[in-house]
């Protein structure tokens, strides 16, 4: 099996983490995240809670990554999008 490169990213409002890792073909999203070292660096990442994706598309930890993929670790939502839309709609109705 040959080696491939995969980027693993995790973004916070104040800082972004980007790690490039070398993996064997057939490696999974979870293996890429573990190899990146981000789990040791950021203890707030919980793979049972945080969703993950590849190039902005939802992925599972067991999905196989391809050479050049960008694995993304997403932060949990802090607000309900439906509730925010409802509040904006109410505010726009009350404006003259």
UniProtKB/Swiss-Prot annotation:
Pfam families cross-referenced by the UniProt entry: Ub-RnfH (PF03658)
Covalent S-S links between cysteines: none
InterPro entries (alphabetical): Mopterin_synth/thiamin_S_b, RnfH, RnfH_sf
Highest rank taxon of the organism: Bacteria
Family: Belongs to the UPF0125 (RnfH) family.
Protein name in UniProt: Protein RnfH
Organism annotation: Pectobacterium carotovorum subsp. carotovorum (strain PC1)
